[in-house]
């Protein structure tokens, strides 16, 4: 019986250390990002936006000013919301803005489908941009899941009375 209690205690201590080690790793991983420009999803959103602009300068888009504005605005909105959410300094707000960025990513996909349907895009252009949007949306969702699973509340609450107890 005594051996069982010692084993149970050892197992609990080992599990506690593993959990603590994981939390420290997550904190280190999250703490290494100092500004939104370092975020991979921001960089991917920026690349997508940079690809949308030259595509919408093509002859096929010339007379559809409103559509051009919409797709450019939506693609820029992805990166803008990632930046704004990150700069707010709290995870709850960052999550809200990530969901908005994910919604804008869906909006760009919808607009790409429409552009393809009316013949504005070549199949290769459409497939490349559409797949890039899908991947970006998945990356945003993965970051959302990581933040939700994390105990970190964000820089806004560091050394604050609102920070959760250690």
Predicted regions and their residues:
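Amphipathic alpha-helical assembly/interaction segments
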Residues: 1-166
């Amino acid at each position: 019986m005594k051996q069982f209690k010692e084993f149970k205690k050892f197992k609990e201590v080992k599990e506690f250390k593993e959990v603590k080690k994981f939390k420290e790793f997550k904190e280190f991983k999250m703490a290494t990002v100092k500004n939104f420009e370092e975020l991979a999803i921001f960089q991917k959103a920026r690349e997508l936006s940079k690809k949308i602009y030259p595509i919408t300068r093509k002859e096929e888009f010339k007379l559809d000013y409103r559509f051009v504005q919409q797709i450019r605005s939506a693609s820029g909105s992805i990166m803008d919301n990632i930046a704004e959410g990150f700069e707010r300094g709290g995870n709850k707000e960052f999550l809200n803005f990530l969901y908005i960025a994910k919604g804008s990513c869906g909006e760009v996909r919808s607009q790409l489908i429409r552009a393809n349907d009316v013949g504005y895009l070549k199949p290769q252009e459409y497939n490349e941009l559409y797949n890039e949007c899908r991947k970006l949306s998945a990356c945003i969702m993965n970051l959302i899941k990581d933040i939700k699973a994390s105990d970190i509340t964000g820089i806004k609450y560091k050394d604050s009375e609102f920070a959760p107890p250690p």
